[in-house]
Amino acid sequence: MSVLKEFKAFAVKGNVVDMAVGIIIGAAFGKIVSSFVGDVIMPPLGLLIGGVDFSDLAVTLRPAQGTAPAVLLAYGKFIQTVIDFIIVAFAIFMGVKAINRLKREEAKAPTLPPTPSKQEILLGEIRDLLKEQSKPAAPITVDPARTL
């Protein structure tokens, strides 16, 4: 099999396509969460703390010298990233929890036995007839008082 055919067989498998869709949706979801944290959560939080902009929080390790920029330890951006992660992890947890609940409900649902087909019913009747025919006949008893 050529490499192209093998790749095509691999790429169109359900799991690979599902994974690709999940990665694309996950990347888009990550951007939404980052915007939510940076634009919606952090500004009010910074205002409550005293007008602090978290993205500007940093410790200067070495000040700028000439054309060389300052070396900063930007812990404010790290705090935003941690909050991003917590929100994404919580959203994933809630999604997995919902899926697990649906699986449990699906497992609890009683499944009805399949109805036999006409052929299966006919085969069952033939089996029963063959069993009846293979039984030995009941012995004949003669009552001497009723003899002619």
Swiss-Prot record:
Main subcellular location: membrane
Query: Which Gene3D superfamilies does the record associate with it?
Result: Large-conductance mechanosensitive channel, MscL, domain 1 (1.10.1200.120)
Could you list this entry's UniProt keywords, alphabetically sorted: Cell inner membrane, Cell membrane, Ion channel, Ion transport, Membrane, Transmembrane, Transmembrane helix, Transport
Q: How does it sit in the membrane?
A: Multi-pass membrane protein
User: GO MF annotations for this entry?
Assistant: mechanosensitive monoatomic ion channel activity
Q: Where does this polypeptide localize? A: Cell inner membrane
Its quaternary organisation is: Homopentamer.
What's the protein called, per UniProt?
Large-conductance mechanosensitive channel
Provide the species name: Pseudomonas syringae pv. syringae (strain B728a)
Q: Which gene encodes it?
A: mscL
